[in-house]
């Protein structure tokens, strides 16, 4: 852990008396290099911009760049997939979000397996909420290689404002 202080001798890191991360923890022991996006949209990140084979090759190259830049910190590749997308259309339930089909999430898991990557499932709740969206992803979040990402900027708590019209927020009550 002390090597993570990068020579800082102030004693602020690691925090005295704080528990160390559990064995197998990714952070702070590894650097996560993630490619972000949605398979349906070229404008939402690299996951949708490139064909899968090309995207994975580019991710592998980026991992190698980071390994070369800092050989002392292992690199963990990741696919950060937007599983619930805020949108301008209210949809059938008026929540202004679209849930990606499970087959798309399964495709991302397959790509991650090919590249030894972890997966972040990102949720943009819009007029919905975490308590409504999270249970639908539970089978995936139970997998050890799958993690959860919350997008606060699309959390429209007033129940009226469409996503993208203002910056949303989360607080402890949401979680």
What does each of the following model-derived ranges do?
Residues 152-175:
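Substrate-binding surface in catalytic domains of secreted glycosidases
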Residues 50-54, 96-100, 129-132, 166-174:
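Alpha-helix N-cap and loop-to-helix initiation/capping positions
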Residues 9, 72-73, 107, 161, ...:
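Residue-identity detector for threonine
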Residues 65-67, 74-153:
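Substrate-binding cleft of extracellular glycoside hydrolase catalytic domains
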Residues 1-98:
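Alpha/beta catalytic barrel-like cores
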């Amino acid at each position: 852990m002390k090597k993570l202080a990068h020579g800082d001798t102030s004693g602020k890191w690691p925090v005295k008396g704080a528990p160390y991360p559990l064995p197998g923890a990714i952070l702070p022991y590894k650097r996560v290099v993630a490619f972000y996006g949605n398979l349906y949209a070229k404008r939402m990140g690299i996951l949708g911009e490139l064909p899968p084979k090309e995207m994975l090759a580019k991710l592998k190259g980026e991992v190698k760049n980071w390994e070369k830049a800092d050989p002392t910190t292992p690199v963990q590749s990741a696919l950060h997939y937007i599983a619930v997308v805020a949108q301008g259309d209210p949809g059938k339930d008026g929540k202004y979000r679209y849930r990606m089909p499970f087959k798309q999430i399964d495709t991302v898991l397959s790509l991650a397996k090919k590249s030894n990557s972890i997966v972040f499932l990102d949720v943009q709740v819009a007029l919905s909420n975490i308590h409504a969206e999270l249970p639908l992803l539970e089978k995936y979040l139970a997998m050890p290689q799958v993690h959860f990402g919350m997008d606060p900027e699309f959390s429209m708590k007033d129940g009226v404002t469409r996503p993208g019209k203002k910056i949303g927020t989360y607080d402890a009550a949401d979680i």
